[in-house]
Amino acid sequence: MKSRLFIISQYLLPHHLLSRLAGCVAECRARWFKNAFTAWFAKRYQVNMSEALVEDLSAYEHFNAFFTRALKPGARPLDETPGAILCPADGAVSQLGPIEHGRIFQAKGHGFSAQELLGGDPAMAAPFMGGEFATIYLSPKDYHRVHMPLAGTLREMVYVPGRLFSVNQTTAENVPELFARNERVVCLFDTERGPMAVVLVGAMIVASIETVWAGLVTPPKRELKTFRYDEASRAPIHLEKGAELGRFKLGSTAIVLFGPEQVRWAESLGAGSAVRMGQLLAEPVQA
């Protein structure tokens, strides 16, 4: 009954208004408030501050600075397996596996369109048909920066407007097309394993998504917008494997897509597996 009421509330709540209000709270610089709120959050979610570059909670200028905190050098060593594809973020594997008939598995019989996830462009989605996906959920306690699974050159970024349903097991099992309905930022790279998409999916109270090359991407005007980076007039944007790609200010999910016959997921990983940025996510399929 509680789950049913929760799902009903997800459809009724003003997602964007609540998220913008949360963003204002998270940027509050009043010392008494930000210190108390940050301390409560760190205790409530058992955040490991010993690995943070700045361990003193009161040193952060606002909650968002704490939430997107940097880690100490070496806190996330990169897997050195030859050709390794790295996990892009801390969190848990929600699902991973093949993209079948253009669909990505969500939970308990629910799936969503890879084309819709990427913004609806058939040409962008085509290289990933028959390929592989991995969905990583970042919990409140996790490190909330997203890094490159492979070295790549940015070709395109797409802001896709949408709802901001909460992202958790309950919504994954009960909200159809969840990740293809929520607001998201699609980043398309050219890599040694062919095209790679990294999709940063928003959720309720996710106030914004940033990338290292564009800064704040959401919230702009809520309309689909494509940014091309492969034009001759632009200097190429190349990011090395393990380099920071972007970050969430309050939460959510990263989805990685590869084309067919390019990667093989690590045998130790499955739905529910805890992961850390930099660990082995997949190995290359040898030609």
Swiss-Prot record:
Binds 1 pyruvoyl group covalently per subunit. The record marks 251-252 as: Cleavage (non-hydrolytic). The keyword Cell wall biogenesis/degradation does not apply. It catalyses: a 1,2-diacyl-sn-glycero-3-phospho-L-serine + H(+) = a 1,2-diacyl-sn-glycero-3-phosphoethanolamine + CO2. Transmembrane segments: none annotated. The keyword Ion transport does not apply. Its EC number is 4.1.1.65. GO terms for biological process: phosphatidylethanolamine biosynthetic process. The modification Pyruvic acid (Ser) is found at residue 252. Its cofactor is pyruvate. Pfam families: PS_Dcarbxylase. InterPro entries: PS_Dcarbxylase, PSD-B, PSD_type1_pro. One of its GO terms (molecular function) is phosphatidylserine decarboxylase activity. Keywords: Cell membrane, Decarboxylase, Lipid biosynthesis, Lipid metabolism, Lyase, Membrane, Phospholipid biosynthesis, Phospholipid metabolism, Pyruvate, Zymogen. Pathway: Phospholipid metabolism; phosphatidylethanolamine biosynthesis; phosphatidylethanolamine from CDP-diacylglycerol: step 2/2. Is synthesized initially as an inactive proenzyme. Formation of the active enzyme involves a self-maturation process in which the active site pyruvoyl group is generated from an internal serine residue via an autocatalytic post-translational modification. Two non-identical subunits are generated from the proenzyme in this reaction, and the pyruvate is formed at the N-terminus of the alpha chain, which is derived from the carboxyl end of the proenzyme. PANTHER family: PHOSPHATIDYLSERINE DECARBOXYLASE (PTHR10067), PHOSPHATIDYLSERINE DECARBOXYLASE PROENZYME, MITOCHONDRIAL (PTHR10067:SF6). NCBIfam families: PS_decarb (TIGR00163). Catalyzes the formation of phosphatidylethanolamine (PtdEtn) from phosphatidylserine (PtdSer). Heterodimer of a large membrane-associated beta subunit and a small pyruvoyl-containing alpha subunit. This is Phosphatidylserine decarboxylase proenzyme. The gene is psd.
